[in-house]
Amino acid sequence: MLLASAVVVWEWLNEHGRWRPYSPAVSHHIEAVVRAGPRAGGSVVLGQVDSRLAPYIIDLQSMNQFRQDTGTLRPVRRNYYDPSSAPGKGVVWEWENDNGSWTPYDMEVGITIQHAYEKQHPWIDLTSIGFSYVIDFNTMGQINRQTQRQRRVRRRLDLIYPMVTGTLPKAQSWPVSPGPATSPPMSPCSCPQCVLVMSVKAAVVNGSTGPLQLPVTRKNMPPPGVVKLPPLPGSGAKPLDSTGTIRGPLKTAPSQVIRRQASSMPTGTTMGSPASPPGPNSKTGRVALATLNRTNLQRLAIAQSRVLIASGVPTVPVKNLNGSSPVNPALAGITGILMSAAGLPVCLTRPPKLVLHPPPVSKSEIKSIPGVSNTSRKTTKKQAKKGKTPEEVLKKYLQKVRHPPDEDCTICMERLTAPSGYKGPQPTVKPDLVGKLSRCGHVYHIYCLVAMYNNGNKDGSLQCPTCKTIYGVKTGTQPPGKMEYHLIPHSLPGHPDCKTIRIIYSIPPGIQGPEHPNPGKSFSARGFPRHCYLPDSEKGRKVLKLLLVAWDRRLIFAIGTSSTTGESDTVIWNEVHHKTEFGSNLTGHGYPDANYLDNVLAELAAQGISEDSTAQEKD
């Protein structure tokens, strides 16, 4: 065992034998489930934190990621890195792919690039870690040494990965990416994890058909191109170590990875566009199912049955000796295969009824809600705030710091005792001024805070990038629409003693404004009007009043890419969950749900909306 502090990065093994990191948000979610222990069920539903990963479940006992619609299994691991490395600072390095979107580098590649960047080297050669690329920090470009093709790279900030302190386990059984040539070979293990990992690596080495044909060293790096660029910088320097060749006046330090292998029994990203785990074409899943024992298969089957109902499709109960669990009919066969492999008898029964809407209600039965004025609200286009510069806005929330602490500004990653490293359009403040946010006490270059404010919604509010404390009144970019609300004389499941509050949202399609992702481009509005339901209880009315505040602040909806259909430039929910299923809970968006009201209050509070905050605003 090793006593140390480290950041935890959860990673999955792709079909080319490379470990790909989950985003910081996903890693935090997995760690939370691990800390919850047996009461969490031993499985992690990734779609709960990232809707793009809705098909995936992680089984913490077998350390496998399970794709519900195909049955594909991928090994996962819990890896530790130095807190001073990129994941410990929330730094993400990404390259621009052919579609114009950004793909994060493998974690150890990103750490190597960040280390060179912090040492102020002009460029770094990645050849010695298996990639024929040069990263030029002056142009923020990646150059293919063979074809001279250049792509843009970027460095951005995200959440810091979860931190652990104390006793960390030593390297465990299963193999990972090969280390230096001098490292002695590890003896193979016969556990399911090792068998699965070795089958993936063997397929890569043997050049199997399908996606496994791609070379290991080219995965997660841009494909070669044909663009001819000027000659590379001088290459007289010799490689310094196996973690990356850095061309520049300073020597590189060893890799900042604490350990390259993870425990099979854990003890403790968005990145913007995270590379999603591979889809149905992989052969790994077929190999992996044969490696799991009855207990693991049974646990995966139960976890899948519990989660698939959130897909929104009418369900088919799959019965076994212990009862029944509903699953998506298109996926019931997958569950049946898993349960049969676990030795459980399987049969299909008639699906329960999906009840999306209440019984018909006449106009005379619709009543206003006691204590809530009116029965509808409208929002129009955003009104620009006039007369206040970013510097004037920030002045309300900041205290100047005459003697800055000797630590990094987490926006530009330069020392607070040095000028800001921000290189964009020049704010009017001096780059060496430092300020402390009044409530949370976090310290930044004022220059960096002004730049961050200018890149945001410019609504007079500020959110601390470290702890997410909101200063001022946060507003969103919700397009114009209407919100109606009233009482109907029916009860929700789980709330038999009260009527129901029905909310109807109506947003028409239109043209995106300057605050939206693609100004001047049209946006769609699918599924409107949207009907949502709350119990007419004291807490239900409290939620409604706060939802009205969120609506007025344009925080209920946004314009983006639908996680359900993949359509871009469309109206989507904005992190405040609503119940759209009236009389059942087959989709996961209905009742009964004992925790829903508390959960939505927490989501609203994260947007700066609570009874206390609204009372302070009125004062």
Swiss-Prot record:
It catalyses: S-ubiquitinyl-[E2 ubiquitin-conjugating enzyme]-L-cysteine + [acceptor protein]-L-lysine = [E2 ubiquitin-conjugating enzyme]-L-cysteine + N(6)-ubiquitinyl-[acceptor protein]-L-lysine. Residues 261-273 have a biased composition (Polar residues). Residues 238-281, 358-389 are annotated as: Disordered. It holds the Pfam family DTC. Keywords: Cytoplasm, Metal-binding, Notch signaling pathway, Repeat, Transferase, Ubl conjugation pathway, Zinc, Zinc-finger. Belongs to the Deltex family. This is E3 ubiquitin-protein ligase DTX4. The gene is DTX4.
